[in-house]
Amino acid sequence: TWWDAVDVIASSGYYPIDDWDNQLDRIEKVVKKFQKPFLFSEAGCMNIHGSAQVPNNWELQGEEDDAEQADWYRAMFTACRKRDWVKGFGIWDWPGNLEGLSPYAVCGRPAENVIAEEYGRRE
């Protein structure tokens, strides 16, 4: 079958801050059915006020809110830590050039510390 050729199940993860458990419950059904490793190929949230509720809305305008971005990452990691089948994350946005950072970038913002703390927990 097609699933026999699949090595990893991946998805993007731009879920509202308070909806992670619901989304993970939904994803878990597929992961358990096909017995494949899972990772978020892309996940992120802008540092714009209100973005934690609509992290997939890259057109959102507003005031910068670094704390909200950090809170979103904290919520994502807290929810995913309870699911041993979540194997990793591709963080959006982590640019090679730090000039002109996008609102999704975490470099030099509190969210970077949240990410470092999370990966410091992992073996």
What label would you give each PLM region?
Residues 30-34, 80:
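Alpha-helix C-terminal capping segments
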Residues 50, 55-58, 67-72, 79-123:
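Aromatic-rich peripheral "rim/lid" segments of glycoside hydrolase catalytic domains that contact
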Residues 61-63:
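C-terminal beta-sandwich/jelly-roll accessory domains of carbohydrate-active enzymes
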Residues 34-36, 86:
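A short helix->loop->beta-strand "cap" motif at the edges of active sites that frequently abuts
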Residues 2-5, 23-30, 72, 76, ...:
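A general structural detector for well-ordered alpha-helical segments in enzyme core domains, enriched
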Residues 18-19, 37-40, 66-68, 116-119:
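Short, surface-exposed, polar/charged, turn-prone segments marking secondary-structure boundaries
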Residues 1-22, 26-28, 36-37, 41-49, ...:
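Aromatic- and acid-rich polysaccharide-binding/catalytic face
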